[in-house]
Amino acid sequence: HCFYNAVMNTNYIEELNESQCAAVTYNDGPSLVIAGAGSGKTRVLTYKIAYLLENGYQPWNILALTFTNKAAREMKERIARQVGMERARYLWMGTFHSVFSRILRAEAKYIGFTSQFTIYDSADSKSLIRSIIKEMGLDEKTYKPGMVQARISSAKNHLVSPTGYAANKEAYEGDMAAKVPAVREIYTRYWERCRQAGAMDFDDLLVYTYILFRDFPEVLARYREQFRYVLVDEYQDTNYAQHSIVLQLTKENQRVCVVGDDAQSIYSFRGADIDNILYFTKVYPNTKVFKLEQNYRSTQTIVCAANSLIEKNERQIRKEVFSEKERGEPIGVFQAYSDVEEGDIVANKIAELRREHSYGYADFAILYRTNAQSRVFEETLRKKNIPYRIYGGLSFYQRKEIKDIIAYLCVLNNNYDEVRFGRIVNEPVRGIGSATLDELNRVVSGMGISYVQAMCESDSLPSLSRKAKVLVPLGETFSELSQHTDDISDGSLIDDILDRFGYREAMQRQGLEGEVRLENINELKSNMITFAKENEGAGLSE
């Protein structure tokens, strides 16, 4: 099937090896591409999409699902180089969560939301769970918010609703064994509170997409018609919910290509289900399997070592990865008796290699599994005067000032957002304590009005009237700025937040630290302007 395509000038024979070429050009049904490490998996996906575009598919009829925004961005850039940006920009390509949130915003009315729904990140979700635990009078030492959040997340990843959870014998026994029988009630309240706040957490983006397609066949039919070919990257990392949605979209026309490697499945603790890739051929009986076994990244020594470990896996799709590179250096294995000794071994090895090969410090990388492990390495490196830089620390979007401004934007977009409102109602400090916030929550819940309306009407509400002097002007400012959420093109909304809510002034009082925080907020503003340029007509909800 490998050929030279004169129309788009792609020479598949020259640019791909035989296995890659076969996987790219097969288009007669479902395909499973088992891609060993360093075997050109991204290359296959990008060429496959280019091949589809060259052979009659329109870009808006192709859906490509990835696990990171970075992977989606890189793929789109590569495809644009092959078929031109004009065609590449219309592809539906992104993470499961970004693509499904786009679908849910378009179809929100079917599932009882507005298109302005808020998306809660993990910290927001945990904060709401903590409030519910407190309201129920439960002991936070027993009902740790992180543990409860993990149980709720696991239920959602298996498409188990609060009602289903309450009726699930396995969940009940698990909760009883862990002495946390109230998890089912927390889950029910959490689900209701998210709906009341017009909010979804990351897991909900999957759950509600599944519900949308399950309960509204006409909507599913529309998206099946639109997505004539579906590609999924890193299939070994999909969970039950993701797999189920892919099945909903592709069961009928069978035009689906999934790429992955069962030997690289490491996310079971986050709900990934290796059975999705192992039993793919049972779910899609007409599947053609392609194996990419040539590793272009590593030496033969490294590849052999990996093969010898993987062959011990009891359940696997057999493959024999090989490399045509030289054998390379043997792999060193050191056993340390403590974390301190481990730090010493690594630091001494760096010093030794620098003496022998005149390497620079930037030629070395230390990889570790958990953030807590960095402490010992840092202490050892400092002791030996070895300069270092830690990557992947606190992310930009986790900084306090960034989360504050995003919370303001979220409340302007969705006046019912309980978690974000709770974060910024007294930020900067304006004398609104937890008692007033609790009362606002009761009013919003009891009267079915928004937080902004509750503040604006607080002078006529007995339980809030004593705080009306602060609440009414605050509510009016929110109300006014909420009218300007359609146009984010110049980022002026962020300036309005800084100036009208006193945030800039509060930062300026913090001296140098405040200046750095304002610079970070400026960076957020630049990101917003760039996003608006790249997504014409986008409003705040996007």
Language-model features, listed with the residues they occupy:
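Conserved phosphate/pyrophosphate-binding and hydrolysis machinery centered on Walker-type P-loop NTPases
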Residues: 17, 65, 93, 118-122, ...
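Helicase P-loop NTPase motor core
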Residues: 33, 37-45, 108, 285-288, ...
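P-loop NTPase Walker
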Residues: 2-119, 197, 220-221, 275, ...
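ATP-hydrolysis module of ASCE/P-loop NTPase motor domains
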Residues: 27, 88-90, 109-204, 227, ...
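Short alpha-helix plus adjacent loop in nuclease-associated cores
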Residues: 99-107, 263-270, 297-298, 390-413, ...
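Conserved RecA-like helicase ATPase core segment
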Residues: 9-15, 41, 47, 51, ...
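Conserved helicase NTPase motor core
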Residues: 14-33, 44, 63-64, 71-74, ...
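Conserved helicase C-terminal RecA-like lobe
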Residues: 176, 374-386, 399, 406-542
